[in-house]
Amino acid sequence: MLAFSPALDLTQNGRGGLSTGSFNANYAGYGDLIPCKTAFIDAHTPGSDQKENFTIIGGGVSESPDQHVHIKDTPGFNIGAAGQPPRCRNSLHSHTTAEVFFVLKGRWRFFWGRWGKAGEVVLEEGDIINIPTGIFRGFENIGLDYGMIMAVLGGDDAGGGVTWAPQVIQDAAEHGLILGDNSKLYDSKKGQKLPEGISPMPILSDEKLAKMPEPPAIDVIPRHVARYLDLMGLAGKSPIKVIGEDAMLPDKPGFEMDFITRGSSGSAWAPR
């Protein structure tokens, strides 16, 4: 079990608990999650066109007006999820704030770098990766069945959007999708055009691309990956801080992440 902070205010109705209306507005059941299949610029690109995107807390960085946001209030971070069939991948992109993934189901390959060749790691169910901010990253379901990963993005606005690798924008245009400089998608297959005053999202210059980090796996995996079996052992009697300034994966992304087991759940809520 994962716990995030800062936590939602549970006394907002002034009587020590949530009202029914407030609770419903801040609750999203797994069976109620509504996917969006046109969330990002690669929605028509072969190999990436079967993705499902879920925005659970906050709007995340979805580029589609069709995206359903389940819980609109954000406590300093956004939580979303991606569901993908086998061999479906999410194209190379970067964020200006933290992006943390927790594997809910399946087997996933995460890769990074300008062309996705700088390094990679394979994660199993329960594993966590805190991808370094400012590098191009992508991920692919390499399991045999439909897989799902949860994502946590730092900031109430999740950093304000996505920066795509140039080849992703070019491939998308060949399949009818254009991203405006307002971070919204326009589908030429549906007869959509860029509105007046909106230009295509510019691709990064060669100068900016040259400054993008290309860390090798040896620099990323030890400080940015936490394995489920290790977490279970470390959190056997008391919760372990996975992400935070003094955590297992040291970082200050604007939120903290703890891992709690049945054996440590009692001490998780004990007064400190």
Briefly describe each language-model feature range.
Residues 100-102, 130, 144-163:
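A short hydrophobic beta-strand segment most commonly corresponding to one strand
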Residues 114-133:
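Short acidic-glycine-tyrosine-enriched beta hairpin
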Residues 67-72, 89-95, 112, 120-122, ...:
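Short histidine-centered beta-strand/loop micro-motifs
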Residues 158-168, 172-195:
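Intrinsically disordered, low-complexity, charge-dense segments enriched in Lys/Arg
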Residues 76, 81-86, 94-114, 152-156, ...:
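Short, conserved beta-strand element in jelly-roll/cupin
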